[in-house]
C-alpha cells in the first residue's frame, strides 16, 4: 500500500444515488488534500467502490485484481463488501487520514476451461464464485474429480465453486454453507442435483482444502448442444464443446481495507438475520 499517495481511484455504479454520492465524496476528498480520479491510477492509495456488491465485483475485475486495497461505500441493497455507509463518509475519510484501518487479504479462485479436440484453454479469476451450467437451462452432465479422484457423476442444473468470501452470495442462495472468510479452502455446491438410480449426485455442498484441485469433466451427453457457460462473478463466458473446467486457488489475491474489527460477524447478522 502506497501510504504516501494522495490519489484515490473511484469506481462508481451508474445509478443516480451512486453518482450523486460519488460527487459528494470527490468534493470531500479534495477538501482534505486527496486527488480522486475516475480513471485507474496504479499509484493510488486505495480503490474506492461506490454502489453495491455488484459494483465492488465489477471494480475488482476492471482493475484486474489490483493489490491496491479496495474499500466500498454502500448505496445498494446487500452491500456485504461495502463497509462504509453514506452517513459515515466523513468518519471514513478521517480514519483513512489517521490510518485507523486494517488490511485483509482475500483469496481468489482460478479456472481453466479446456476445449475438446483442441489445445485451446481459457483462464479466468473470480473473487466470489464460478458457475458451470448449460447455455439453455437444460441438464448438464459432469464427472466431478477432486485431486484426480472421481467423486461423482453429476446431473443437474450446474455446479457452483465458491470462495469463503463468495459463500454468502449465490452459493448461500443455492443452499451452500457460509464459510468464515479467513478459512483456507473453497466450496463445491450443486444446483438442482438429480439423485436417482440413474444419476447419483451429492445433494449438499462439499468443502475442500485450498490446495485441492477440482475438475469438472463434461460427459458425452453434453455434446448434442452447442455451448456451455462458465460464469465468473456473474460475468458470462460461453464456450463451445467444453472438455473440462479446472478450479484451483489463484496465486493472486486482493487487499481490502477493514475499519471494524468485527465487521464479518456484524455483516452476517445484519444481512441475513
Curated annotation (Swiss-Prot):
> Keywords assigned by UniProt?
ATP-binding, Cytoplasm, Kinase, NAD, NADP, Nucleotide-binding, Transferase
Known catalytic reactions = NAD(+) + ATP = ADP + NADP(+) + H(+)
Source species of the chain? Finegoldia magna (strain ATCC 29328 / DSM 20472 / WAL 2508)
Which GO BP terms apply? NAD metabolic process; NADP biosynthetic process
Cofactor(s) needed by this chain: a divalent metal cation
Q: One GO molecular function term?
A: NAD+ kinase activity
> Tell me, what does this protein do in biology?
Involved in the regulation of the intracellular balance of NAD and NADP, and is a key enzyme in the biosynthesis of NADP. Catalyzes specifically the phosphorylation on 2'-hydroxyl of the adenosine moiety of NAD to yield NADP.
Q: Could you tell me where this protein is found in the cell?
A: Cytoplasm
Give me the Gene Ontology terms describing cellular component. cytoplasm
Carries keyword Cell wall biogenesis/degradation? no
Positions annotated as active site in the UniProt record: 53 (proton acceptor)
Q: Name one Pfam family in it.
A: NAD_kinase
Q: Please state which protein family the record places this protein in.
A: Belongs to the NAD kinase family.
- Which parts of the sequence bind NAD(+)? 53-54, 58, 128-129, 157, 168-173, 192
EC number per UniProt: 2.7.1.23
The protein here is known as NAD kinase
* InterPro entries registered for this protein in UniProt: ATP-NAD_kinase_N (IPR017438), ATP-NAD_kinase_PpnK-typ_C (IPR017437), NAD/diacylglycerol_kinase_sf (IPR016064), NADK (IPR002504)
